[in-house]
Amino acid sequence: DTVRRQRQMCIRDSSNTHFDVIVVGGGPGGSAAAAYNALNGCKVLLLEKEIWPRDKICGDAVGGKSLSHVKELGVLDMIESTPHYVVDSIVFGSANGSEVRVMLPKESYEKMGLQSGYALPRMQFDYMMFQRGQEIVRENGGSVIQDFSVHEIMFENENGVHKIKGVKGRIGGRKSDNDELVFTSAVTIGAGGYNCPVSRVITELHNEPHRDDDHFCGGYREYWDNVEGLGGESGAIEIHFIDEVLPGYFWLFPVQGNRVNVGIGMLISEHRKLKKSRKKSLKKIQKWVIEEHPRFKPRFANSTLVSGSEKGWQLPFGSPRKNAEFQPRRVAMAGAMCVGDAASLVDPFSGEGIGNALLSAKMTSKHFDKTQHTDGFTDEACLLYTSDAADELCR
């Protein structure tokens, strides 16, 4: 019944065809980009290929870089009213077994009315961001369509310059027999993750690589209950650099109650270089750490794996590329900008992507002016956004 109501609302929202801003992807970056541009007076169309709520594979930490945006958009109170874990510190573990606990600057955040950090399942956090984002979009005359598969990014060649003009797609998925819908806009914002169709078209039109495995990280996540030394309402998250996982790390992030997000991340190119004796899937490496590693086996002795939580994904890092014209890669062009993972902005040290997704989302609203860009987001404007994003987020 919920899905039926959502689809009826989507059909109503599909009656408009031209917008100031189209946002492809309704994760935190896309929801924030849609909200910030709507608050600027833009008529926004927010497109999401799934029906919410949906799972998202991640470490589940929401750090200090994100919290001012979470508060500004009215999501902080929503987080506080639902189960969550307050992060006050990070434990770093080395290969030789030594550990150091780094306390987060609690007082600095409290002055701003914030906690130092949160951890909660992305299904929960992303849903709240999307709910608030779509409220702001609709309050400002825009539309939101879920279960919408974008199968074409439309572009034209104007005086030798390619310009993105909008999208084509269908409600119900790529293979749906529903009518094709066409939407146009002055700017299209790509927020569809590491394989975002907008970011792919941007790089393809400029004959540049979209993917570089030296800057892509493979990630694997499970949820476990009752891991020794973790749980409660607040405390540390843990990041361990152990021999069997290098060059990467093993993490333990409590999310609520006694539930812990347990995962492993490693550069894809480095994972491929591992000796045959160690070249296993991330899932198998994590299984060995949990069941055999002398430091972690005892901590999982009385814990339970949450069935169905075993999932993998990829993270595009914002680390500098060799010989690239733009860093970390081209993330905008006439008629389009990308944010978050779609712009390859994941922090290469921590693997955290939400903060840079929200920062880049707000930046799009500063660079797009619906009055100035009535004929479309210009090539000059896209270069300014690209430069500002690199200077602010990839230093």
Question: Model-derived features: where do they sit?
Answer:
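Active-site-proximal substrate-binding core of FAD-dependent oxidoreductases
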Residues: 366-387, 395
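Predominantly flavin-linked oxidoreductase catalytic cores and closely associated redox partners
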Residues: 132-295
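FAD/FMN-dependent oxidoreductases across multiple families
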Residues: 270-272, 276-367, 372-373
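Single conserved hydrophobic/aromatic residue that forms the stacking wall/gate
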Residues: 1-7, 11, 385-395
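Glycine-rich FAD pyrophosphate-binding loop
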Residues: 39-58
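N-terminal Rossmann-like FAD-binding beta1-loop-alpha1 element of flavoenzymes
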Residues: 21-45
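Short beta-strand to alpha-helix junction loop
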Residues: 109-131, 276
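N-terminal FAD cofactor-binding segment of flavoenzymes
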Residues: 57-95
